[in-house]
């Protein structure tokens, strides 16, 4: 069967922070994927919507019940068009990846497609270096998530990088069983595939999934006196810790729910 590559993504960009890099990499986006779909919030800037369309990305505008539902919508849209090599990636992640590690990103899908046994799902995780570039709250809470997932899968895992790969049958399976409304799909999706066939769930380590958010806040970083100062002021807050700790718990709970007792094959 011929490969039909697609990008599925989600976008919330009221300040048009993504528009410049979207336009810069529009030709690459059109060339890399036969189909691309983005679930876009209603508050996203018209400038970003125009940039998405320039890049050949179908913009599915509307507020869903949560990012989990938005992710399912984007994946379902490209799967319905016949895609059988689907890269899900948060758009800010993808743009930073393309900007900073273009060769790694360009070769990623071919690498996964050649894997044997043929995978249905790949967790696209971060190398030790890439993971360490994130704010302390993100490192601590996502490390806790990944420890829980690793215990369930009995292997080192990183499921919280906002990126994954699905085959056609992997997409059908995940879409038929996924119910999480939040980012807890990070754990739910690979758990669904793992329950079906652990041999067809890959873990891949990527440099380009390093911390991306500062890329889109250059003015704020400068005003704060530098990247470290901006990260500290933005992320090292009680509210941020509460949110991320809650998400860590929800993500591991989703894995336990899918796997039943938490035991695996």
Task: Identify the residue ranges that each predicted region occupies.
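C-terminal catalytic/acceptor-binding lobe
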Residues: 187-265
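Active-site nucleotide-sugar/metal-binding loop of Leloir-type enzymes
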Residues: 72-85
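Donor nucleotide-sugar recognition loop
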Residues: 176-189
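Short beta-strand-to-loop acidic/aromatic patch adjacent to the donor-nucleotide binding site
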Residues: 83-96
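A recurrent flexible, glycine/aromatic-enriched loop bordering the glycosyltransferase active site
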Residues: 129-136, 147-164
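Conserved donor-nucleotide/metal-binding helix-loop-beta segment in metal-dependent transferases, i.e.
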Residues: 94-130
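Short, well-formed alpha-helical segments that are part of the catalytic scaffolds
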Residues: 7-34, 44-46
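Conserved nucleotide-sugar donor-binding
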Residues: 159-175
């Amino acid at each position: 069967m011929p490969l039909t590559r697609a990008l599925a993504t989600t976008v919330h960009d009221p300040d048009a922070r993504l528009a410049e890099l979207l336009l810069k990499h529009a030709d690459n986006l059109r060339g890399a994927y036969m189909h691309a779909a983005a679930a876009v919030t209603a508050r996203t800037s018209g400038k970003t919507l125009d940039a998405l369309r320039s890049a050949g990305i179908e913009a599915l505008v509307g507020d869903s019940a949560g990012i989990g539902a938005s992710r399912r919508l984007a994946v379902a849209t490209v799967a319905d068009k016949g895609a059988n090599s689907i890269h899900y990636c948060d758009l800010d992640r993808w743009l930073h990846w393309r900007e900073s590690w273009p060769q790694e990103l360009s070769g990623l899908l071919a690498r996964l497609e050649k894997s044997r046994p043929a995978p249905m799902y790949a967790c696209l995780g971060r190398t030790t270096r890439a993971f360490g570039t994130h704010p302390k709250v993100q490192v601590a809470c996502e490390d806790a998530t990944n420890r829980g997932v690793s215990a369930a899968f009995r292997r080192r895992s990183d499921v919280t990088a906002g990126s994954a790969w699905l085959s056609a049958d992997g997409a059908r399976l995940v879409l038929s069983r996924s119910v999480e409304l939040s980012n807890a799909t990070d754990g739910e999706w690979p758990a669904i595939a793992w329950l079906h066939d652990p041999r067809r769930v890959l873990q891949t380590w990527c440099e380009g999934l390093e911390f991306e958010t500062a890329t889109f806040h250059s003015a704020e970083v400068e005003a704060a006196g530098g990247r470290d100062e901006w990260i500290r002021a933005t992320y090292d807050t009680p509210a941020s810790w509460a949110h991320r700790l809650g998400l860590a718990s929800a993500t591991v709970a989703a894995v336990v729910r899918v796997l039943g007792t938490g035991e695996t094959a």
